[in-house]
Amino acid sequence: MRESKANKIERAKGVYQSLFSEYPDAKCSLYYKSPHELLVATILSAQCTDHRVNQVTLGLFEKYTSPKDFAYCDVSELSKDVHSCGYHNQKSKSIQGASLKIVEEYGGQVPNNLDELVSLPGVGRKTANCILGEIYNVPSMVIDTHMVRIMNLLKFTHTKDAKKIEFELMALFEYKNWVKLTHLIIDHGRAVCIARRPKCGACVINQICPSAVT
């Protein structure tokens, strides 16, 4: 029997409340001190762990201290600096390209709306929503691999398409909770609902998860 939207919304409330109680301090785990540093870190985080990114940016942000430094740097040198994050050639080009546009078109300020953010080289909805939520306090959802996997397990979505998932979840979870939800799901995905070996017996939402094996 197909679950009604009203019932999904009720389950979504339960999921949020339970995870919030379990991970009250959940927050962005990327290291940054400015909007532009978060932009760089988020670009580097694609197909890479936040832990690795933080190891790299610790020295990177001492070497490149402003958007201008990234915009006018030697991209081959930048590529070497971010090598351990993977896909270093593409990521370095994206970072330099985005930084150049920020410097030349936005006065060195990272844009504060989705359309302008996704116009930056290498910036998609995931990175843009991260910036909007973390820096500008605009309710938004970052659909990463944890969100895709766990929301499918919860049967709140039946697709792997990040944009479709984003809009489906917007209809289920309260607007004010969108940013926090992402961090809760990421923490839960790392600690309990681990890919290929979820710890359903230790899960605080196993009673309302259709995929739970207890």
Task: Give the location of each predicted region.
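Catalytic cores of DNA base-excision repair glycosylases
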Residues: R2-T214
